């Protein structure tokens, strides 16, 4: 059976997405249920800045179907400490202790390493060793030095997922590399043509046909166009699978 396309956006709480994506007049508390009725996944932006309280998490999970998946962005300060601090295990415990509240609706934790942080194989291995393995981990490492066989091998051995990120300022299209049990693609350009989205869908098809699920997350924008792109992406994959 082909894998599932779990498309979504970075965040959902954007009143400016009305009327293109959200109906006019929709109250703030109804944004997430409406989003989840049309899209199967969402990156939570606010967890990158602060750890959410349990009652807020319970509100999120109650608002979405059982097969919906949240991707939690690891809090940025603790992420750096987990990779380069004196107590990575302690930082990871702080980062992850609230995650069980998400239950089965937790899709993954997105661990972002900024462009100012070069590759360090020893510290990456310490992070992967200390990470709670039942929690799916996705690594987005932006410094070019992380694009190395050593990184791929370490992630593969730990069952962690390498994030593929497509950005406006990239001259070359990034490779999709399978290191874990699913794929994670961030489409972060400010705009995409249909031909460009078809090309990404086409590149995912062989992995999906091997049974891998693929998260595909678009950046948020001003009017909700990105949410519409995400909503149509699974159908786009089905179409290019047939037409080539």
Locate the predicted segments by residue.
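Residues lining hydrophobic/aromatic ligand-binding pockets adjacent to catalytic sites
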Residues: 1-244
């Amino acid at each position: 059976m082909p894998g599932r396309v779990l498309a979504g956006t970075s965040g959902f709480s954007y009143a400016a997405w009305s009327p293109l994506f959200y109906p006019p007049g929709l109250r703030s508390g109804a944004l997430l249920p409406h989003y989840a009725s049309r899209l199967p996944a969402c990156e939570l932006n606010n967890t990158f800045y602060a750890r959410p309280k349990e009652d807020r998490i319970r509100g999120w999970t109650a608002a979405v179907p059982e097969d919906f998946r949240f991707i939690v962005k690891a809090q940025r300060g603790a992420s750096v400490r987990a990779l380069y601090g004196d107590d990575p295990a302690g930082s990871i415990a702080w980062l992850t202790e609230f995650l069980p509240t998400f239950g089965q609706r937790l899709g993954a934790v997105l661990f972002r390493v900024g462009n100012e942080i070069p590759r360090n194989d020893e510290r990456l291995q310490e992070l992967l060793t200390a990470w709670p393995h039942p929690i799916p981990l996705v690594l987005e490492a932006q410094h070019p030095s992380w694009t190395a066989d050593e990184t791929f091998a370490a992630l593969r051995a730990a069952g962690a997922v390498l994030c593929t990120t497509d950005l406006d300022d990239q001259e070359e299209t990034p490779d999709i590399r399978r290191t874990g049990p699913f794929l994670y693609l961030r489409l972060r350009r400010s705009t995409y043509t249909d031909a460009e989205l078809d090309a990404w869908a086409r590149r995912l098809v062989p992995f999906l046909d091997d049974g891998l699920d693929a998260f595909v997350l678009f950046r948020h924008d001003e009017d909700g166009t990105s949410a519409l792109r995400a909503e149509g992406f699974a159908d786009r994959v089905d179409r290019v699978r047939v037409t080539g």
